[in-house]
Amino acid sequence: MKKITLALSIPIIILASEYKIPPKAIADIVDAPLTPTMSLSPNKIDYLILSRSSLPSIEELSAPELRLAGVRINPAMNARSRRTSYTEAKLHQIGQSRSIPLKGLPNNAKIHSFSWSPDGKSIALAVSSNAEIHLYIANVKTGKSKMLLRSPLNLTYGAPFVWRSDSQSLIVKSVLERRGIAPKRGMKPSGPTTQENLGKIAPARTYQDLLQSSYDEALFDFYFTSQIIDISIKGKKKLIGKPGIVKRIDPSPDGNYTMIQIIHKPYSYIVPVSYTHLTLPTSRSV
């Protein structure tokens, strides 16, 4: 007796659908603002209140991401990916109920980093409104802000700027002008990736997001290299040294010297950039 098997063809329809919105009671709980961040000025009189969203947006979560030398970056913004940003900032004085909002920032601006001047009269801000992050400076007394440097900041690694002790200028890490386009994956490797297993057997820590190829090295150079700029609060600027991968910038207390920690090749494939070797050139301020 023959058995006849009938195969039923069930059509599968895939439709593009939009995100569904939960009931308002649930949405209000999820979207409730987080506790604001407070930052006290060096003079212990003024303070800054910064607000941020409770959850990252779909745009932020879907942004491109590169994993290089133990650091995850957003290549479109030349900054760490999914880092905390603030959507609103207001100035207050201790003992006063009145607040001063920061004025002059772009619409829908996000503040990625900020720093009080040593005298407490100004605040430097790393602000984005699109794919680039720029340096703004705010007057603490009036709340008025203005863009100080048109070149985009480099926020991939380390602090993007630091104040000099006189509160009249900052040292800034900027993306290189005319740096061209990012390296393509099809580039020919310069040689094989090799590791040596010498010495005694010992346990070794492992890390994620490390460099793995010459292509990763090329991307690391492209996105992490900065030009150091000395810029006054009035907008006068001058370049300091040659471009490099800057780990740290330390101005001397008297303002005459600046110690700059720079990372050089060969880059490590077994530890993140925070563990790599560096050189310590010192430049004299003129």
Task: Please annotate each region the language model reported.
Residues 16-283:
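Beta-propeller folds
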Residues 1-4:
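Positively charged n-region of N-terminal signal peptides that target proteins for export
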Residues 7-13:
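Bacterial N-terminal signal peptides
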